[in-house]
Amino acid sequence: MSQSGKNGLTYSDAGVDIDAGNLMVEKIKPHVRSTRRPGADGEIGGFGGLFDLKAAGFTDPVLVAANDGVGTKLKIAIDANKHDTVGIDLVAMCVNDLVVQGAEPLFFLDYFATGKLDPDQGAAIVAGIAAGCREAGCALIGGETAEMPGMYSGGDYDLAGFAVGAAERGQLLPAGGIAEGDVILGLASSGVHSNGYSLVRKIVSLSGLAWDAPAPFGEGTLADLLMTPTRIYVKPLLKAIRATGAIKALAHITGGGFPENIPRVLPKHLAAEIDLDAIKPPAVFSWLAKTGGVAANEMLRTFNCGVGMIAVVPAEEADRVAAVLAGEGETVFRLGRMVARQDGAPGTIYKGSLAL
């Protein structure tokens, strides 16, 4: 029989503070409301989040779902006590995976797990999630905050995100008809994004630099620059898809780099020929390669190396698609082309060299 009365145990004695959780909910409500969009009212507190597809303007939609995390980039956030941008990363990693299938992100849910809940820290994280949702045009309709003493040490926490989008039936990507000679457009990344951070942290450890030290590759501290949020490509890509009808395939360059991600959207008889001379890697990648002695091939299969997204388009439409994307604020360049692929050959081949 459990103890009761004034000397009995409480949930708080076990390390779970329900009042702290309630305080965090009150702090995040304005951020959640800021993500309101057609189909979602921007309120939280129910047992489940609601979304009205008809109110969002869809007639015969196919739903597309994705989930992801931020990986060990979170360790930098924790060590540097900088929590206001990892939520943007969380949203970006999910919604960029939706748009590559031609889907408009509609709603997002998050999972935040920690050993000891700090309401201000949690609110900062959710503020970043809300900022990412606004940028992607999706509503934050719910989430879970789990305080789990004994599961996480110190100030450690983890995040997971879940996004659902939709496309009208028949408008999903990749589309058919990818052909030899099609052009591959590259869209510049904002930096390292959210992949390869275990290697990043290893290199920083070897360098002996503290997180608050001036970054050797740009203006700001090492933590600030390495915490640059993942770019969200949703609205520019949706504009280009709808305005041109010319995009045949998109690939989000995440873990595994070019060789693991581009072939996922290609037919087996075609390969992507990437012109490495066309890439202008941000200075952070040169610093990582030189400081860690990381070979170019390893860089290409670990990091985005300056290209966060690629689009496959007909050669005659490349300039028009690039112009639409540039008009929406993207840095776009011709990255390569589609070539015939021999049996057993890799789906990504390179020419030129990466300027690291």
From Swiss-Prot:
InterPro entries: PurM-like_C_dom, PurM-like_C_sf, PurM-like_N, PurM-like_N_sf, PurM_cligase. Its EC number is 6.3.3.1. It catalyses: 2-formamido-N(1)-(5-O-phospho-beta-D-ribosyl)acetamidine + ATP = 5-amino-1-(5-phospho-beta-D-ribosyl)imidazole + ADP + phosphate + H(+). Keywords: ATP-binding, Cytoplasm, Ligase, Nucleotide-binding, Purine biosynthesis. It comes from the Bacteria. It holds the Pfam family AIRS. GO terms for biological process: 'de novo' IMP biosynthetic process; adenine biosynthetic process. One of its GO terms (cellular component) is cytosol. It is found in: Cytoplasm. Its main location: cytoplasm. Pathway: Purine metabolism; IMP biosynthesis via de novo pathway; 5-amino-1-(5-phospho-D-ribosyl)imidazole from N(2)-formyl-N(1)-(5-phospho-D-ribosyl)glycinamide: step 2/2. GO terms for molecular function: ATP binding; phosphoribosylamine-glycine ligase activity; phosphoribosylformylglycinamidine cyclo-ligase activity. HAMAP family: AIRS (MF_00741). Belongs to the AIR synthase family. This is Phosphoribosylformylglycinamidine cyclo-ligase.
